[in-house]
């Protein structure tokens, strides 16, 4: 659990110009399971790293302004405690994926992930299994049912509470 920031919900930053590839992670963010930030360039990611504690970085190999490998090296020099994964298009188990894993390891990445990236992938990257996350939420006073409510239902409950309070 020492890999997570002070917030219970992990802060995850995706740096990839192809935003549409992260639908499953966006769904997890809407459920309150992760705080998801998406950027398309390395410069934007570095600015964010100055302002926010990040638990996991997911970095595509090709960015708008630099290579993903260069960004991994820059982030490692600034935020060594955060987990960093390279996102590759190659199928896990393929020869190209094995080469990508070697290259990513050489620049300091903790893992190589392939699409679709799921909440389970992030839990493995952070070293925090789902059962332990449930315990962390319960210990923090969050009801399990509250954490899994869709945003629409949560927003409706807040609206009703505001109307009742005046």
Language model: regions and residue ranges:
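Two-component/phosphorelay signaling modules centered on CheY-like receiver
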Residues: 18-37
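Conserved active-site segment of CheY-like receiver
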Residues: 17, 87-94, 116
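C-terminal output helix
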Residues: 113-126
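As written
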Residues: 54, 68, 99-112
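Acidic, metal-coordinating helix/loop segments flanking the phosphotransfer/catalytic sites
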Residues: 38-56
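CheY-like receiver
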Residues: 131-165
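Alpha-helical interaction/dimerization surfaces of two-component signaling modules
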Residues: 27-29, 48, 103
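Conserved phosphotransfer microenvironments
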Residues: 55-77, 81, 89-90, 94-97
């Amino acid at each position: 659990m020492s890999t997570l920031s002070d917030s219970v919900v992990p802060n995850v930053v995706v740096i990839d110009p192809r935003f549409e590839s992260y639908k499953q992670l966006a769904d997890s963010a809407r459920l309150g399971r992760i705080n998801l930030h998406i950027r398309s360039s390395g410069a934007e990611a570095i600015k964010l790293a100055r302002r926010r504690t990040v638990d996991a970085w997911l970095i595509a190999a090709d960015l708008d302004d630099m290579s993903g490998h260069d960004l991994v090296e820059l982030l490692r020099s600034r935020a060594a405690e955060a987990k960093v994964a390279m996102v590759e298009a190659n199928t896990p188990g393929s020869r190209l994926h094995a080469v990508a894993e070697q290259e990513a390891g050489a620049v300091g990445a903790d893992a190589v992930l392939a699409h679709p990236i799921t909440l389970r992938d992030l839990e493995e990257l952070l070293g925090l299994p789902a059962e332990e996350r449930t315990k962390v939420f319960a210990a923090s006073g969050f009801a399990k049912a509250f954490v899994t409510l869709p945003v629409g239902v949560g927003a409706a409950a807040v609206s009703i509470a505001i109307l009742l309070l005046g």
